[in-house]
Amino acid sequence: MLTFAGMAINQRCRPRSGRRPPLAWARPRIGLQPLGSGGGARYDTAMVQLLYDAGALLGESPRWSAPEQRLYWVDIEGRIIHRTDPVTGADEVMTLDEQVGCVAPRAGGGLVVAMEDSCALIDNWGAAPRPFGPAVLAEKPEQRFNDGCVDGAGRLWVGSLTSDKAHPTATLYRLDPDGSLSEVFGGLTTSNGAAFSPDGRRFYHADTPTHTIRAFDVDPASGTLGAGRIFHQFPLGNGRPDGAAVDAEGCYWSALWDGWRVVRLSPAGELIQTVELPVQRPTMIAFGGADMQTAFVTSAGKNLSDEERKAQPHAGGVFAFRVGVAGLVQADFAG
C-alpha cells in the first residue's frame, strides 16, 4: 500500500478474462439517419461486445494509450483507476482514498488525474499522486471535479459538478502544463462532454441537466474561447448528454445518461447515427485499438432498483464496438 497526504493506493493486477462473455454478446440495431431530406433511414447491424464486466458504480473517463495499447478509465465512486487490455481482458487497478473524476496519459509517461478538489500527477503506474495546481475546490464541499479532456497544446480542460442542483455554481477550468489553473466559464451544474474538433478550433461542452451541447470557437494557441452557441438540443425524457469524443470526420459522439445509447452528431449538429446499448446509463465514449476504429463505452451501475438491474445485468461494464470512421488520437497532457 502506498500512502500520500492521507491518500492510500492499492495496486493489484486482476486478469479478468474469465468474466469476459462470448464476443457476440449483443447485436443491437444501429440506426443511420440521413442528413438531408428524402429517403428512408437505413439500418445496419453492429456487434456490441461486453469488454469488461466491472460492475462499476460510476465508470467514466475512458482514455486510450496508443504506446501501451491499453484503455485507462475510472470508477469515480469506487475510487479506482483501471488499466484494461482489450485483447486479453486483463485489468489492473489502483485504488485511491478519494474520488477521481477523470484521467489522461502524460507526454512524458504517467498520468494526470482530476481528484475531488485538485489535480495531481502520477509519475508511473502504482506511484503516489502528487499535487499539481491549486486545490481550487477545497472550500467548495458541494463540488468535485468531473469530466475532462486534453487539447492539442497538451492542456487539460476539466470541469466540476455540484450536488446543489438549485444553484449552478460548477465551473470549467483549464490546467496548463506549468500547473496554472484558469477559470474558463461558470454557471454550470454538471460539466461534461468536453471535446475538440480535429483542427482544434472548436470546443464542445455539455451541462448535462440542460440536455444541451454547446460549441465554442477556440484559439488553439492561447486556449481562449469565443461566444458559445447551441450545437444540439436533446428532447427531455430520452437521455442527457454525458461524456463525448470526436472522430476523424469531425463528428461528435455523445453518451446519453438514462438514454441506453450513444449518438453521432455531424459537425453541423445533426443526428446521423444511434448505437443502442444494453445499459441505461452509458457515461462516456473513447476511440482506440491499433486502427482507432474501436469505440469503448463506460457505464454506471449505481442507484438501480432490483428490477432495473435484472434488465441490465452488466450495468457498470465497459462495452466496445467497431466504427467505420477512426477516432481522433487525443494529445497527452504536457505537464
Spell out what each predicted region is:
Residues 48-53, 89-95, 130-138, 180-186, ...:
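A short beta-strand motif characteristic of beta-propeller blades
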Residues 54-68, 97-112, 139-155, 184-202, ...:
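Beta-rich, blade/repeat-based domains predominating
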Residues 65-66, 71-76, 112-117, 156-166, ...:
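Conserved beta-strand positions in repeat-built beta-propeller and related beta-rich domains
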Residues 80-82, 118, 170-173, 212-214, ...:
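A short loop-to-beta-strand structural motif that recurs across blades of beta-propeller domains
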Residues 128-184:
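Hydrophobic alpha-helical segments and helix pairs
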Residues 288-335:
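Blade-level signature of beta-propeller repeat domains, shared across WD40, Kelch, NHL, RCC1
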